């Protein structure tokens, strides 16, 4: 949630505005591009609280194919820019694998999407590692900070 985020307007004018064409993940791309323009300070403190219930619009939309396509744009952008370290990279690829297999779409399109993402190293091994790390963090009651 970026409701309390502050950035310099001059930096906004320096970024490409392709995020405005995205309907689901444009804010992700916006914040990535803004972060590339300067220093970022992070406060590791939960400042607001919200939860999603199964009937919320966010949960219903979450599995749609269009949103998946936008997420793939975001992740391939991050991977191409080499913004993530090796561990983050592997976990993010596991997350992408999970998103693809859980998205409600035709099996043939799902297989094609997975095949397309293999060139980025998105594999079932990455998926298993991401799931194991998430489960361990839940069992140990720790928040993974990458």
Describe the predicted segments one by one.
Residues 1-64, 71:
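Conserved nucleotide-sugar donor-binding catalytic segment
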Residues 16, 85-88:
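Inter-domain helical "communication" segments and dimerization helices
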Residues 90-103:
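Amphipathic alpha-helical repeat scaffolds of TPR domains
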Residues 80, 101-146:
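Membrane-interface aromatic/basic loop that binds lipid-linked glycans or pyrophosphate carriers
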Residues 15-17, 76, 128-131:
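A general secondary-structure boundary signal
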Residues 40-41, 93, 110-112:
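Short hydrophobic/aromatic segments of transmembrane alpha-helices and their interfaces
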Residues 47-54, 59-86, 109-121:
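Catalytic core of nucleotide-sugar-dependent glycosyltransferases
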């Amino acid at each position: 949630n970026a409701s309390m985020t502050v950035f310099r307007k001059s930096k906004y004018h320096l970024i490409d505005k392709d995020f405005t064409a995205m309907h689901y993940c444009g804010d992700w791309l916006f914040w990535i591009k803004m972060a590339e323009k300067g220093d970022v300070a992070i406060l590791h403190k939960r400042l607001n609280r919200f939860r999603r219930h199964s009937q919320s619009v966010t949960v219903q939309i979450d599995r749609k194919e269009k949103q998946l396509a936008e997420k793939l744009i975001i992740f391939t952008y991050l991977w191409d820019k080499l913004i993530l370290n090796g561990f983050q990279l592997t976990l993010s690829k596991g997350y992408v694998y999970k998103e693809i297999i859980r998205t409600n779409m035709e099996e043939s399109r799902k297989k094609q999407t997975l095949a397309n993402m293999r060139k980025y190293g998105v594999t079932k091994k990455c998926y298993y590692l991401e799931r194991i790390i998430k489960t361990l963090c839940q069992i140990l009651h720790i928040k993974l900070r990458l």
